[in-house]
């Protein structure tokens, strides 16, 4: 079948490489664009990466606590309204509410010292 031949050729040339796709997606979502591991897994799968490769790639991503700290969390030291807005933003990126609260509290404590 011609379609299978074309797909196989693309795989051999590295154009259809799930590991590369994961790396490319992860690169786009680093630093200020950081997302939770759970969110990243969903992105990988939505982009057509196989479940097996996507789950294996998760070990290469920073844990959620580290990735939250990569974000601009200056608002964590702000007033209640700013902190609430930041918490909603982080929740929208797939971070667990308990992790968000704990991390923001740590940042606030560090700022006081």
Give the location of each predicted region:
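An alpha-helical, amphipathic repeat domain used for nucleic-acid recognition
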Residues: 1-113
